[in-house]
Amino acid sequence: MKQSISERIHALRMWFKPNIQAFIIPSTDPHLSEYVAPHWKSREWISGFTGSAGTVVITEKKAGLWTDSRYFLQAAEQLQGSGIDLYKEMLPETPSITKFLSDELPPGESVGIDGKMFSVEQVESMQAELSAKNIQIVFCPDPMDELWENRPPMPESPAFVYDIKYAGKSCSEKIAAIRTELKKKSAESVMLSALDEIAWTLNLRGNDVHCNPVVVSYLLITEKKAVLFIAPEKVTEEVRNYLEEQQIEIQNYSDTEIYLSDLNSSSILMNPAKTNYSVFSSVNPQCRIIRGEAPVALLKAIRNEQEIKGIHAAMQRDGVALVKFLRWLESAVPSGTETELSIDRKLHAFRATQDLYAGESFDTIAGYKEHGALYTIRQPRKATQHCTRKVFFSSTQELNTWMVLRTLHVPLR
C-alpha cells in the first residue's frame, strides 16, 4: 500500500526515537552528485518534492525543506498538505539548517545523519556549529533501507568503454599525468569519488544516472597501481578486458571502505568537499590524509585537440536539429494542437536523427505562459491554443555535451 508523505515522516520519527531527536536527508548520493540514481532519491521519497536540490530536516515535532530560488514555486506547490514547511535559502529571514536545529533542540540532544551522504566539509561545519549548543551528530545507517518499500535497487546498468577517438587520450596517459601531479603534492595516492572524474580518467561511461553518462564507482590511484571499486554485475567481458589491458585492478564497490582501512600507503590525497565522511573516515590511521583538490578537475578542463574537434562537430549537428525544430515550431504552434510535452518530443526526434546522438544531457523543459517561470519542472501540461513562447534545454551527443536555453516568440518573424 502506498504511504502518504505524513505516514513516511511518522515512520522515520519512529525509526530514530528515542536516541535521536532529528534527522537530516540531503538530495545527494555517496559520491555527492547533484543528479542521482533513483535508489538515492530519499529526499524526494520522504517529501514529495522532485527538484534536484534540497534538504529535508525532520524533528520530533517539525519538518522542513530547504531549497534555493530555482525551486521556490515548485516546492510551494509540491509541499502543500504534506506537513513540511518550506525554508527559502539565501533569504535574510530564513535560518540555516544548523540554526534551526540549535533553536529547536535543547542541549544534550542528537541529530542523525548518514555519513555516506555528506561531505567531510559539511559534517565538520555542522559539528562545529551544533557543538556550540551541546548538540551532537550521530552517524546512522541509511534508514531508507528499512522504511522505503519497493525502493529502487542500486544502479545495475553495465559500464562501457568510451572510444579513444573521441576521448583523445588513453586511460594510461591520464593516470600517468595524475601521478605526476601527485608527486608535486607529496602524495603517494589519491582517492577519487566524483563520478565525472572517474569517467574521464578511465574513459568509461555508463547509464547509472539519468542524463549523466557515468558509472557508480570509486577509483584509487597509487604510485604503482590503480583500483576501481565497482559492482561486479556492471563489468562486462569487454570492460574487464579493457581494464586489464590498462592495468586497472577491480574490487567490489561494497568493499571500498574495507580496502581503505587496510591501505598500505604513507599518504593519500582526498578532497574534503568531494569525499563523503564515511569513506574519508575509513582510511587506515597509519596513512596520512592530505586534504586538497584532486588533480583530475584541472587536467580534464584542458581540452585536447580531439575533444575540441568534438565540440565543434557536436555544435554543428545540434545546430542543424535546432534549425529544423524552429522551422517546424513556427508552423505547428498556431494550430493550437501542440502541447508542451509534444513539443518536447518533437525536439528530441530532430536531435535523435543526428549522427552520434547519445541522449539528452538534460530533460527538455518547455514552459508556456505562467509555466515559463517554472523553468525547473518537467511534467506533461497542456499548452493553451495561442502559444507565444517556449523555453527548452539542449542535449548530449557522443562528441560533447552542453545545455541551451531559448525564449521564443511565435510567429518567429
Each model region followed by its residue ranges:
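Conserved hydrophobic/aromatic beta-strand scaffold that supports enzyme active sites
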Residues: 55-57, 218-220, 365, 392-394, ...
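Flexible glycine/proline-rich, aromatic-decorated loop/lid segments
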Residues: 80, 282-296, 392-413
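Beta-strand segments within the central parallel beta-sheet cores of soluble alpha/beta enzyme folds
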Residues: 339-342, 363, 392, 406
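Terminal domain-start leader segments
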Residues: 1-341, 345-346, 352-359, 370
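Short, solvent-exposed loop/turn segments at the edges of secondary structure
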Residues: 51, 214, 361, 388, ...
